[in-house]
Swiss-Prot record:
GO MF, any single term: 4-alpha-hydroxytetrahydrobiopterin dehydratase activity
UniProt-listed Pfam families: Pterin_4a (PF01329)
Record's protein name: Putative pterin-4-alpha-carbinolamine dehydratase
Similarity comment: Belongs to the pterin-4-alpha-carbinolamine dehydratase family.
Amino acid sequence: MTELAQMKCEACQADAPKVSDAELGELVRMIPDWTVEVRDGIMQLERVYKFKNFKLAMAFTNKLADLAEADFHHPGILTEWGKVTVTWWSHSIKGLHKNDFIMAAKTDTLLD
């Protein structure tokens, strides 16, 4: 388990700062299987998880839903046959907060 996966999310208000470029570089290295995407001008973290069938993909999605509820931070999730695409960003600040990196790392632990 990574250091990030052991951290707790903090409340993220609309005036919370987005991660700086320096922080972004450091945090991205801690979650190497994730990519940074920009959609509609909003920076987001994304990863595609592969599974052998739809049932396993759905089971992972349900575990992720439980994690998101427990941490009060919710991703974009696209569940398809054999894969789940997970996208993290902080809606309130329209960009990336440290919480998104924490949740990406925690999402990776669901495979263990």
